[in-house]
């Protein structure tokens, strides 16, 4: 097997693993949606942060999962990363969020220190007194 074939095989295996992880994570999100609805925790309009640090409105509503409001779950069950590119136009008109494949570990590879299992973030969000700073 050539190096190119080996690299392609590794990439294929990694993609398959990511898909399997996302399926497991989506099941957790679906359970969260049902629990949030049962507890009467209403979704709120989501805001995103541009790379420049400016906060902008989005076209989605949902629940923030991190205190810094960098990730959220939409009321449609989608997972959103809320740090987005944009400029003056986005500051005026807002941004249209695109869903991301949900990970089982939130913030993996990040440097801000707020990483952990998706299940833990979802559970914390259901607890009374949770509020994004």
Model-derived features with residue positions:
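Amphipathic, interaction-prone secondary-structure segments
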Residues: 47-84
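N-terminal domain-onset segments
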Residues: 1-58
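Generic structural hydrophobic/aromatic packing signal, biased to beta-strands
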Residues: 32, 36, 79, 104-106, ...
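Short linear, low-complexity motifs centered on an aromatic residue
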Residues: 82-94
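Generic structural motif recognizing short loop/turn segments at the entrances and edges of beta-strands
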Residues: 39-44, 69, 77, 100-104
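Helix-rich interaction surfaces within compact, conserved domain-sized segments
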Residues: 92-133
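Generic structural signal for short, flexible, solvent-exposed coil/loop and linker residues
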Residues: 2, 30-32, 52-54, 60, ...
């Amino acid at each position: 097997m050539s190096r190119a074939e080996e690299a392609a095989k590794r990439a294929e295996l990694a993609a398959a693993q990511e898909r399997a992880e996302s399926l497991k994570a989506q099941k957790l999100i679906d359970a969260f949606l049902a629990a949030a609805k049962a507890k009467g925790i209403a979704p709120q309009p989501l805001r995103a942060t541009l790379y420049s640090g400016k906060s902008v409105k989005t076209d989605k509503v949902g629940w923030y999962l991190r205190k810094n409001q960098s990730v959220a779950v939409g009321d449609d069950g989608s997972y959103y990363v809320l740090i987005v590119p944009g400029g003056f136009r986005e500051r005026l008109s807002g941004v249209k969020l695109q869903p991301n494949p949900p990970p089982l570990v939130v913030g993996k590879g990040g440097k801000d220190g707020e990483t952990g299992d998706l299940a833990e973030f979802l559970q914390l969000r259901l607890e009374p007194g949770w509020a994004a700073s």
